[in-house]
Amino acid sequence: TLDYVFTAQPVAGEADGAKSVVMRLPVAEGAYLEYRYLIYNTEAPERDYLVDFDVRLVNMAPEMANQTQIQIDWANTTFQNEKGFQNENMYTTISYRFPGESSIEDLGMSEKSKSKSISTSVNWVAFKQQFFSSAFIAPQNVTNANLAFDTAAPGSELLKSFSAQMTV
């Protein structure tokens, strides 16, 4: 979607006080790809800093014929926010959880670079920093995931570059 221009819809209020932001990419007459961001009311503590993201394929059955899975390529570069690079780097990694497990797995905290291929289902994948995380949570799990990070050089104002290729 990097090379395409989406059309923004007006910001709308939801019944629970959240706001929705919708971006559409026309594909054919009456068919479009829709990105829907739901920004929750921060007066509810359990939803502070929570942004929901849904992808909708509207009237796209002819364009998506025979598709049973979608490949997601997710990447993010994190900036150094704290004074001490080494300390912040130790708390920055990729985390994930297997279905039915209570423990959380991760790629390691202070490695220069690391990657892992997971061929079984995972509930979610998160790019984790010391105080904040970005998580991809699929409604019916992620079936495969290739996860990796590279650590930036101290003094570059960056911390890590994350990537995750997942099948949903």
Predicted region positions:
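Soluble non-transmembrane domains of integral membrane proteins
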Residues: 1-168
